């Protein structure tokens, strides 16, 4: 039975809000809480970031299982379970009395990340809407694109008011009181709406070449995204921007991502996702050329181009596998496609940080080069 348009809007709003909480309470926590966490154990903050990197590797191992489970039974139960796992991991952090428990808490959060972030949400929408999930996928990324906008200030407020342990406990309670009920609002099973053009029951197996190319694209673009998230201010200062300009330019990435997703929702949705993905992948290399060519004054242009490309690529990671390979087995396939990306993402801050320390601004050619390779890989993928 077709889901009413109003119900469709509520599903996107509920899942997008739950995703905002998931990202804000995991991916964006270390930027605010790593230093006080480490200080309470007499450790360097690098240990907390190391624990977070471990969590991303854990999420890579969980993702394929979670995706396959969503393919079989729908996403509602898996996403609800992810909220319980997130809450448990955050609670372990809140009561951790030793570095071992700190790492254990992050490992549990990594399980929650593998079950409850974008890949699981995209698979849930594919189970409900089939090949018509592109619009809803864009919708939840529009909402969750504000995760850092919400998460960093809220984590900072809880830290300043109560402390880092209470901040972790606060996020755990938010999962139980808000995110879990929102995910419970989702349809049970795979309540598929009928597509305007019915999908075939079975088609030829996906091209192994296309799968490998797509896995490569996802891995290197996630590497670039994470490297820039960790080191953008330092990179822009190496180009000649002042500290204030670097911070101000960095603040433009979030709005650029959201603006690009609005463009995808309004204009680019008329085209095959490969078209928008190719344009998006070329944005970072173009931004790098601007930064090297014009130095510090190009900081804003770099941030806007990188942010816009990253915003559309986030959507493409959900829509491209759906458009190329269909919705059958989508969740498991998405989990496997993103597993290398999570591992490389975990290493990105260390690798690019070392390159920036050794080469200064010229380190940008590392990310520009692999961004160009991603564009070439996307050009090598054919719609059929």
Predicted regions and their residues:
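C-terminal transmembrane helical hairpin of 12-TM major facilitator-type secondary transporters
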Residues: 253-257, 271-320
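Intracellular juxtamembrane helix-capping segments at the cytosolic ends
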Residues: 115-129, 312-325
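Extracytoplasmic
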Residues: 10-45, 62-66, 152, 226-233
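A late C-terminal transmembrane helix in Major Facilitator Superfamily
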Residues: 148, 327-359
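Extracytoplasmic gate region of multi-pass secondary transporters
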Residues: 30-34, 208-259
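Helix-to-loop junctions at the C-terminal end of transmembrane segments
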Residues: 62-74, 260-273, 356
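Symmetry-related core transmembrane helices of the 12-TM Major Facilitator Superfamily/SLC fold
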Residues: 166-184, 363-380
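Conserved MFS/SLC helix-loop-helix module at the cytosolic interface between two early adjacent transmembrane helices
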Residues: 61-99
């Amino acid at each position: 039975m077709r889901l009413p348009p109003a119900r469709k809007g509520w599903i996107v709003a509920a899942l997008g809000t739950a995703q905002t909480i998931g990202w804000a309470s995991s991916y964006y926590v270390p930027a605010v809480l790593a230093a006080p966490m480490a200080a309470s154990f007499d450790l360097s903050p690098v240990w907390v970031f190391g624990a977070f990197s471990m969590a991303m590797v854990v999420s890579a191992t969980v993702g394929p299982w979670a995706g396959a489970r969503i393919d079989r039974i729908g996403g509602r139960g898996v996403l609800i379970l992810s909220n319980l796992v997130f809450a448990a991991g955050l609670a372990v952090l809140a009561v951790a009395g030793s570095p071992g428990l700190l790492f254990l808490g992050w490992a549990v959060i990594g399980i929650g990340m593998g079950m409850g972030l974008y890949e699981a949400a995209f698979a849930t929408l594919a189970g409900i809407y089939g090949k018509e999930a592109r619009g809803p996928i864009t919708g939840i990324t529009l909402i969750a694109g504000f995760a850092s906008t919400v998460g960093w200030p809220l984590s900072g407020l809880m830290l300043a008011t109560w402390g880092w342990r209470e901040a972790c406990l606060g996020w755990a309670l938010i999962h139980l009181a808000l995110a879990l009920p929102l995910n419970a609002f989702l349809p049970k099973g795979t309540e598929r709406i009928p597509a305007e053009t019915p999908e075939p029951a079975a088609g030829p197996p996906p091209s192994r070449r296309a799968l490998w190319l797509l896995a490569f694209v996802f891995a290197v673009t996630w590497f670039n995204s994470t490297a820039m998230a960790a080191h953008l201010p330092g990179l822009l200062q190496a180009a000649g921007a002042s500290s204030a300009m670097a911070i101000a330019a960095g603040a433009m990435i979030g709005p650029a991502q959201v603006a690009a997703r609005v463009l995808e929702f309004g204009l680019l949705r008329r085209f095959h996702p490969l078209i928008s993905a190719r344009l998006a992948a070329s944005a970072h290399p173009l931004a790098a050329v601007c930064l090297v060519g014009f130095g510090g004054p190009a900081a804003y242009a770099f941030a806007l181009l990188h942010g816009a490309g990253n915003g559309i690529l986030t959507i493409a990671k959900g829509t491209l596998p759906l458009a190329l390979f269909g919705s059958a087995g989508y969740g498991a396939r998405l989990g496997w496609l993103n597993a290398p990306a999570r591992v490389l993402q975990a290493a990105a801050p260390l690798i690019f940080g070392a390159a920036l320390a050794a080469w200064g601004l010229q380190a940008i050619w590392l990310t520009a080069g692999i961004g160009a390779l991603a564009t070439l890989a996307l050009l090598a993928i054919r719609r059929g």
